[in-house]
Amino acid sequence: NRKTCGDTHLDSYTFIGSPIISGYKERGSALKERMREAFLDFFEKRGHARLKPYPVIARWRDDIHLTIASIADFQPHVTSGRTPPPANPLTISQPCIRLTDVAAVGRSGRHLTTFEMMAHHAFNRDSTGEYHYWIDNCVRLCDELLVETFGIDPTEITYVENPWSGGGNAGAALEVIVGGLELATLVFMDLEEHEEGEIEIKGLKYRQMDQKIIDTGYGLERFCWAAAGTPTIYETVYPESVRFLRKMAKFDDRIDSLDIPLDIDTLLGVLSPGVLRMRVEFGRRWVYIAC
């Protein structure tokens, strides 16, 4: 009976002040740790090997500097089929840094530049007959996680079709919307970029590939926000920093003052693995210097 997909300018956040995930009273790192463990444990109990996260500096790739998604851990070597996956199927919670939304940080109340992408991946291959699960079972696992583990009302979950592409691959995808917030994206990756491809997605040509890959992304911080119900995601993820900065700088509750803790967290995330981030052209371009 919905008139919108749940993620439009007409849809408000229904979880603000009324969390859609109950039973989580923690905030900050304690909440993230508990939420992360609940996710990983769910998939580990369902036959997925738990992997340690990869570095946020994508040293194994020559097309990107930063790890921007969990699937980036496996592109291009595993997704192309040249290298076997480290486990199959697998689950991981991958720290990411993504600067494309930097202008929206602090304005929307939900955008982040550093975040963790919880995920479960499966690598199916037609030529070898290796098959784990595909679309139906992927959606079933997602639904079970949301309803049985996190107690979300199933009537509040909306699955929105929206093709995905990135890193030379593409596929059909479902965005998972609850309470006006996109919690996850389920990608059914079976296409590879090719100049003679017959399938066009977002201006690029693709062709079918031998592998059929389950590529999912669940926003850890967004799950935490949905469990906390704070006015913005920043009070959930950085509660101590927000309180300290408001007190010391005499900030009021305006959202645009809340991006400072996130900037600090992103900077520390980049410096820790050995990369210095330097802005060379304000608002337009970033340069990364490996140390």
Language-model features: locations:
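Cysteine-rich micro-motifs
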Residues: 2-10
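Structured aminoacyl-transfer and RNA-binding surfaces used for tRNA recognition/handling
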Residues: 15-291
